[in-house]
Amino acid sequence: MSRYRGPRVKKIKRLGSLPGLTTKKPPIVVRDPRKLSRPKPKKKSQYRIRLEEKQKLRFHYGLTERQLLKYVRIAGKAKGPTGQVLLQLLEMRLDNTLFRLGMASTIPQARQLVNHRHILVNGRIVDIPSYRCKPRDLISGREKEKSKALIQNYLDSTAKRPIPLPKHLLLFHSDDPRDLLKGSVKKIIDRKEVGLKKIKELLVIEYYSRQISP
């Protein structure tokens, strides 16, 4: 299954807030109180509940089905709780790290920056959005004016809707426009700092349980 490129508001109406996918909000529908109330929604099956949690992860981080399954399998073989390791793997991706630093308004924007070779990691161009960031990695835009302008524009737009910087990241501010825009990774992210606040990662693991069992 390919990466989702359809209407983003449609997804957040069904799944709730997905800040990595879009900054938009679904329109508020004002209903006529004189009309009969709608019937109560049917109770969701356990399968659907797990499916929706999986879809939240997939759309928030902008992954294909195959990519997410691969991360679940890697997490299952790692030390520590599988769900927590899965979230750490997703959060430490380069595209998500740029998004959490405020260098992009959404993860798709961050992915474009990486794909178009605007981003340096430890002084070298990295054009792979799935690059796994590590503690002490230094992330910056290239010295090209186009790269600087793009990232500064994203930083300005994210400043209008301030989002707390997670504790595992550090953003260097400078008043000199000639300076490179830089951020660094201080440590592996803690579970409580994950960007998708209401995710129930254990349900995602349960959804994939048959596909990852030996």
Swiss-Prot record:
Compartment(s) of residence: Plastid, Chloroplast
Gene Ontology CC annotation, any one: small ribosomal subunit
Listed CDD domains: S4
Domain spans labelled S4 RNA-binding: 92-153
Keywords on record: Chloroplast, Plastid, Ribonucleoprotein, Ribosomal protein, RNA-binding, rRNA-binding
Function comment: One of the primary rRNA binding proteins, it binds directly to 16S rRNA where it nucleates assembly of the body of the 30S subunit.
Family listed: Belongs to the universal ribosomal protein uS4 family.
Record's protein name: Small ribosomal subunit protein uS4c
Taxonomic placement: Eukaryota, Viridiplantae, Streptophyta, Embryophyta, Tracheophyta
Gene from which the chain derives: rps4
